[in-house]
C-alpha cells in the first residue's frame, strides 16, 4: 500500500462529514453491533459512541496496523465505550456475532481495488458477503455508465477552466500534469492536454484537494467500478434496502468555487443491503 506521509491530514479528512458517513444508523433495525471496515483512527466509531452511547457494540477493522495503533490511542483517551479493534483475519477467526451486525464499508472499496491483487479483492468480497452480516452499508465513489458520456465541448470547457485555475496556482498545475501522466494521458502540444473521457475530469476533481498526501491520492483509483457493476455484485441472499446516487454537496460547491465548473455528475453512492433470512 502507498505510504501515508501525513497521518494527521489523512485522518482529519476522514473525520469530516460524520453525519453523512453514519447515514445508515436509523435504517438498521435489530442490529446489535456495528463493524467498521477501514476504521482508520477510530473517529467514526468514537462519533457513534458519543452520539448513541452503548446502543451498539462497536468493532473496528483495518488492514493498516499503524492505523489500528492510532485508533487504540485515540479511543482509549477519548471514548468511554469499549471498542474492539482487529485486522480482517483476526476478526474472521474470533467473531461469531456477524448475524446481528451491520458491516460498514465507508470509502473502502476504491482502496481495496487501488492496492489489492485480484486474489485479495476476491477475498474482500467473500468477507463482505459470506460472513453473514445482517446489514451491509456501503458508501463510496462511483459514476454510472450514462454519466461517463459527455460531448467534447463539455470536456474542453472543463479543461479550459482547470487550466485557468492552474495558471493561478502553479502547484495545482504540477499536480494536474502528474495526475494526467499517471492516468496514461498525454500532451497533444505545448498548450493543450487531452483527456480521454469525462471520467478523467471527474476523477481529478474528486482528488485535487488532497495535496498533502498527493503521491498516495494520485495513484488511487477512486472510480474502479461503475454503479451498475456494484449493484450486480449483490448476492441473492441480500436485498437492497436503500440506495442513493448523488453529488457530494461540499464537492460540488468547492469545484464551483475553485474552477467555476458546475459539477452535476453523480459521484458518490450509498447502498444498504439487508440479509434475507
For each feature predicted by the language model, list its residue ranges.
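A conserved beta-strand element that flanks and buttresses the S-adenosyl-L-methionine
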Residues: 104
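Class I (Rossmann-like) S-adenosyl-L-methionine-dependent methyltransferase catalytic domain
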Residues: 1-50, 55-95, 131-277
